[in-house]
C-alpha cells in the first residue's frame, strides 16, 4: 500500500469568492470542518502516513491550520512562490517523493468510500508496468455539486478516451489518483496542467470508477449541495 501522498491546495479559489477573499479555499468549512481536513482524513483512513501539501494563496493561514493538526498523516509543506497549476505544482514537489507511485488528492472534493476504500481500490488496480497514472473517475449522473460535461469515456477494454469539445462524457475525474514520477519525464517547466501529461501519455493512464459518493465543492452552489448531502447521509463513511 502506498504511504505517501500529495494534496493540491495552492489555488486562488476564485469561484468560491467572496468566501475566499479572506481565507484560502482549503479552509472553507463544510458543516464546520475545513475542506482540506476531509482530504487529509480520507488519506489517513486508508493508511497513508505522509501528505505533501502545496501552498501559495494565503499560504500562511493554510500552513498555520496544518501546523496545529495532530492527527495523521504527517504534513510536509511545498510552498510555491507562484501558482504552478496541477502539473507544475506536483513537479515542484517531486523532490519530496521517492521514485515510486504516490496518491494525489484535490482539496476541493469530498470522496466518500464505497464498500472498499477508494484508495485501496486504486492500489489494487495499479499496474506499474503499464501505468504512469491511475485516475479515480465517477459517474457524472451521480456526482454532487458537479455541473460539467464529464471528462472521459472508458471502453470495454478499459482504455480511456477524452471527450471531444462537442461531446458529453459519462465519467468525470474526481481529483483522486495515483501518479508515478516518470509521468513527468520531458514535462514543461513552470506552470502547466496535468492534462498536458494525460493527453501526451493517455495510453499509460488507467482508470477506476468510484463506487462511493463524490462531492465536488468548486463554488458556493457546490458547497450548499455538499452540506445538504452530508446532512441527509449522516452515516456515510467519510
Model-derived segments and their meaning:
Residues 1-30, 44-46:
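Glycine-rich N-terminal loop/short-helix segment of MobA-like nucleotidyltransferase
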Residues 1-7, 33-106, 110, 186-189:
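Conserved N-terminal catalytic core of the sugar/cofactor nucleotidyltransferase
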Residues 16, 62-66, 226:
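Hydrophobic packing residues within well-ordered alpha-helices of enzyme cores
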Residues 57, 133-151:
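Short beta-strand-to-loop element that shapes/binds the nucleotide-sugar donor at the catalytic cleft/hinge
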Residues 71-75, 156, 203:
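A short helix-to-beta-strand connector/capping loop
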Residues 102-103, 110, 114-127, 141-144, ...:
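Catalytic-core segments of class I nucleotidyltransferases/pyrophosphorylases
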Amino acid at each position: 500500500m502506498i504511504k505517501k501522498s500529495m494534496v493540491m491546495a495552492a489555488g486562488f479559489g476564485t469561484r468560491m469568492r467572496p468566501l475566499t477573499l479572506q481565507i484560502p479555499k482549503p479552509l472553507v468549512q463544510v458543516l464546520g470542518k475545513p475542506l482540506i481536513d476531509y482530504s487529509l482524513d480520507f488519506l489517513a483512513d486508508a493508511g497513508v502516513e505522509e501528505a505533501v501539501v502545496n501552498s501559495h494563496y494565503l499560504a500562511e493561514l493554510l500552513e498555520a491550520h496544518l501546523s496545529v493538526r495532530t492527527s495523521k498523516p504527517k504534513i510536509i509543506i511545498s510552498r510555491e512562490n507562484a501558482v504552478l497549476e496541477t502539473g507544475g505544482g506536483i513537479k515542484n514537489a517531486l523532490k519530496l517523493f521517492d521514485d515510486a507511485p504516490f496518491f494525489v488528492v484535490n482539496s476541493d472534493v469530498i470522496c466518500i468510500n464505497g464498500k472498499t476504500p477508494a484508495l485501496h481500490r486504486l492500489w489494487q488496480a495499479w499496474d506499474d508496468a503499464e501505468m504512469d497514472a491511475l485516475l479515480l473517475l465517477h459517474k457524472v449522473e451521480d456526482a454532487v455539486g458537479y455541473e460539467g460535461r464529464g471528462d472521459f469515456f472508458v471502453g470495454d477494454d478499459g482504455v480511456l478516451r477524452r471527450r471531444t469539445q462537442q461531446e458529453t462524457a459519462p465519467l468525470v475525474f474526481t481529483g483522486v489518483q495515483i501518479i508515478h514520477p516518470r509521468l513527468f519525464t520531458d514535462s514543461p517547466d513552470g506552470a502547466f496542467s496535468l492534462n498536458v501529461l494525460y493527453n501526451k501519455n493517455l495510453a499509460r493512464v488507467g482508470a477506476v470508477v468510484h463506487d462511493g459518493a463524490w462531492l465536488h465543492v468548486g463554488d458556493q452552489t457546490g458547497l450548499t449541495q455538499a452540506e445538504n448531502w452530508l446532512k441527509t447521509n449522516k452515516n456515510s463513511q467519510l
